[in-house]
Amino acid sequence: LTLFKSVFDNKTYERMDFKNFHSFETALYKLAERPFASKQDAVLMSPATYLPDTTRANANVVEWSGWCAVDVDDFECGGKLKEVLAERFAQYHYVCYSTASSTKANPKFRLVFPLTSSVPVDNIKHFWFALNCQTSGPAIP
């Protein structure tokens, strides 16, 4: 996990490593408790591991660590988000949390899935395509 202090931060030195997904999950819940003044002040996170002493850029990515995330915007579930996600992703373990720009009128959220291994940089594009094929459909736009 690489953390960025805001959308304007591109320094990659703030890393957190976890022994398992449960530890990562616990950290996600702790991050969710951090207050922020506006969306621009919200902490950002990436599954990417970057080359040492570089900035946030695709050219500096070494791999994705043991998790991935799918952003979901413009999703209409008739107030039954939990039920829809449980039905669509019952076979997967995941964490769902709202993003900084989410509102009751326009919910936006992220689904975070554990991976069984890291994704080397050369496989990220293929993995991303497969992940989006797997998660899109009638339940997720």
Outline where the language-model segments fall.
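Signature for HUH/AEP ssDNA processing cores
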Residues: 1-107, 113-125
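Hydrophobic, well-ordered secondary-structure segments
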Residues: 124-128, 132
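Flexible helix-coil linker/hinge segments at domain or subdomain boundaries
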Residues: 132-141
